[in-house]
From Swiss-Prot:
Gene name of the encoded protein: CAV2
Lineage: Eukaryota, Metazoa, Chordata, Craniata, Vertebrata
Cytoplasmic topological segments: 1-86, 108-162
Name this protein carries in UniProt: Caveolin-2
MF term (GO), any: protein homodimerization activity
Modified residue annotations for Phosphoserine: 20, 23, 36
UniProt-listed PANTHER family: CAVEOLIN, CAVEOLIN-2
Subcellular location: Nucleus; Cytoplasm; Golgi apparatus membrane; Cell membrane
Result for mutant: residue 27 to A: Greatly reduced Src-mediated phosphorylation and binding of RASA1, SRC and NCK1. Completely eliminates Src-mediated phosphorylation and binding of RASA1, SRC and NCK1
Description of post-translational modifications: Phosphorylated on serine and tyrosine residues. CAV1 promotes phosphorylation on Ser-23 which then targets the complex to the plasma membrane, lipid rafts and caveolae. Phosphorylation on Ser-36 appears to modulate mitosis in endothelial cells. Phosphorylation on both Tyr-19 and Tyr-27 is required for insulin-induced 'Ser-727' phosphorylation of STAT3 and its activation. Phosphorylation on Tyr-19 is required for insulin-induced phosphorylation of MAPK1 and DNA binding of STAT3. Tyrosine phosphorylation is induced by both EGF and insulin.
Function, as annotated: May act as a scaffolding protein within caveolar membranes. Interacts directly with G-protein alpha subunits and can functionally regulate their activity. Acts as an accessory protein in conjunction with CAV1 in targeting to lipid rafts and driving caveolae formation. The Ser-36 phosphorylated form has a role in modulating mitosis in endothelial cells. Positive regulator of cellular mitogenesis of the MAPK signaling pathway. Required for the insulin-stimulated nuclear translocation and activation of MAPK1 and STAT3, and the subsequent regulation of cell cycle progression.
Family: Belongs to the caveolin family.
Effect of residue 36 to A: Abolishes phosphorylation
The organism of origin for this protein: Homo sapiens (Human)
Pfam family for this entry, one: Caveolin
Length: 162
């Protein structure tokens, strides 16, 4: 530990093909990222959110509405669910992702730089604390518990039925 006196040797290599000489912005090809078969929940974190119309609205066999009402309500349910989800994700996904990123970065930093050094320090000090605690237990708590146990061992109860 101390001051580093060696110079770091850093080099940057760039191909002429990958470096653009004009000052305009280059955007990624959106068709490359628009894979509709992509599984966006590979660990099935939100498998409980797969709700259909029948999971929310159900009519028993004895009471049915008109078929047209059922079909229209089903279509309206699916359309409104789709549109509202898209609308909410447009306005909430980026800010919430930003907030979650800040939160996870903060928690990671606290865990790495505060919590784990504290735990490691406690584990280093623990053997000496364990020795002191064992001495206190042997000197104070063990004789007290033994005395109380002997006092209560002489108590006897007898039940009689009158």
């Amino acid at each position: 530990m101390g001051l580093e006196t060696e110079k770091a040797d850093v080099q940057l290599f760039m191909d002429d093909d990958s470096y653009s000489h004009h000052s305009g912005l280059e955007y990624a090809d959106p068709e490359k990222f628009a894979d509709s078969d992509q599984d966006r929940d590979p660990h099935r974190l939100n498998s409980h959110l797969k709700l259909g119309f029948e999971d929310v609205i159900a009519e028993p066999v004895t009471t049915h509405s008109f078929d047209k009402v059922w079909i229209c309500s089903h279509a309206l349910f699916e359309i409104s669910k789709y549109v509202m989800y898209k609308f909410l994700t447009v306005f909430l996904a980026i800010p919430l992702a930003f907030i979650a990123g800040i939160l996870f970065a903060t928690l990671s930093c606290l865990h790495i730089w505060i919590l784990m050094p504290f735990v490691k320090t406690c584990l280093m000090v623990l053997p000496s604390v364990q020795t002191i605690w064992k001495s206190v237990t042997d000197v104070i708590i063990a004789p007290l518990c033994t005395s109380v146990g002997r006092c209560f061992s002489s108590v006897s109860l007898q039940l009689s039925q009158d």
